Amino acid sequence: CVRAVFPPPTHPTHARQTEESVSTKSTTATADYGAKDIQVLEGLDPVRKRPGMYIGSTGLAGLHHLIWEVVDRVVDEAMAGHCDRIGITLLADGSCRVDDNGRGIPVDPYPSGPHKGKSAAEVVLTVLHAGGKFGGEGYKVSGGLHGVGVSVVNALSQRVHLQIDRGGKRWEMEFTNGGKPVSKLAIVGDTPARGRKTGTTVTFLPDPTIFASEGTEFVARTVLERLQTMAFLNRGLEIAFADERPGREQQVTFQYKGGIVDFVKHLNQSKEALFSKVAHYEDEDEGQMLDIAIQWNTGYHEGIHG
């Protein structure tokens, strides 16, 4: 038995009333929607209003994305040949510190436009789409948000402390409550005789009101896995990780002289390789770089990583 059920026919009068009702609502909605409904968000406000647009989510993935953005800025510095060490430390108070021995974010006054007179470092940390990767000769290669990224981290943090060693001097600046400067960038002394001569240190404490769903506690394993991959992909770069949180203290350093050759060996370490030597090829042409490593094993599944 097949039975078809149709809705009762609509009375013509009822149909006209419905159309008139919809038309009236549409006209009213159009009349209510005007220039006053258009919002213009300045500074870092857009990031705090819609953080998911910038870091993907406000869960644990988004929380760890803050670390990736700060670290990726330094990786670009390393790829440009100006840095060979990155340090990432999870501090006891829940904050994260990322330090490097790169050139140090510029500290001189910004030369033009609405930000004229502010230090370049303040502009980089408080203005979206500000950085050295969008043009000029500062960087040949870059990835991630960068420039945007560090300012996004500032916007989504309860507190940020910036320290720069450059030109023999140590500069510092602090931000609070979503990137509001506590004071101007200032010299606090000479660069210490021991240790790095130039570089940048960014220490940030994620804002718990932004990451309310899953909290602001970093997962060491998540950080370590990402850092190891970065070390494989950036041959010779030293990436030092430390966890100073009580009961979870550890220190791990990644550095791979063989780059992606070591990466392939690592991926194949639990498999039976058909050849002991990893095939490797690299070349550069017109600014484009190619780096390939291959090793066959007895398995049936291919693994392509890039």
Residue ranges and their predicted role:
Residues 16-37, 94-120, 131-266:
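GHKL-type ATPase core
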Residues 61-83, 149-154:
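Conserved ATP-binding N-box helix of the HATPase_c
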Residues 241-306:
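GHKL/Bergerat-fold ATPase module in large chromosome/replication-associated machines
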